[in-house]
């Protein structure tokens, strides 16, 4: 199931490809894992809502901070260990070998002719929307707390950025592969944008 990269302390598997998924496997819009989809959004959205309304709901900063940290911790565990595997077939984790060396493993479910399971497009959209949108919100909250001198909230906001950013980074690595693939993908994208811009300028002139 896993192919190891000898030049990196990570392990990757064959990754989902959009074209192969479209041609080889039927896509359905219905939600196949409603409970997982619910909890994928519940903890992270609840943490954001509590952060925004905590000063209105409670005068105790400690109570609000503990509630937000608990919600963020539950979200990190649920997204890392449950919802990613069920909703999009991705998983990342760490293990230490016999020599005490740490290895990061990034897994993606392989598409095989024997696999009759369908991919839920609705679940995929829910997963990636929640995975990307919430860390962006926490980054905005971090700048807001910094510039408004709400120093006491910085620790809470930074924890939100770190925990949800870690899941985002891990699943992006699962999706695009190793660092080399991620770098080449970014380079290829920038090259295409540069070429397209130059082509457009040439046609205009």
From Swiss-Prot:
Keywords: Acetylation, Membrane, Transmembrane, Transmembrane helix. Its main location: membrane. It comes from Mus musculus. Belongs to the TVP23 family. The modification N-acetylmethionine is found at residue 1. It is a multi-pass membrane protein. It holds the Pfam family DUF846. Residues 1-27 are annotated as: Disordered. This is Golgi apparatus membrane protein TVP23 homolog B. It is found in: Membrane. The chain crosses the membrane at residues 34-53, 54-72, 126-146, 152-172. GO terms for cellular component: membrane. It comes from the Eukaryota. Residues 1-21 have a biased composition (Acidic residues).
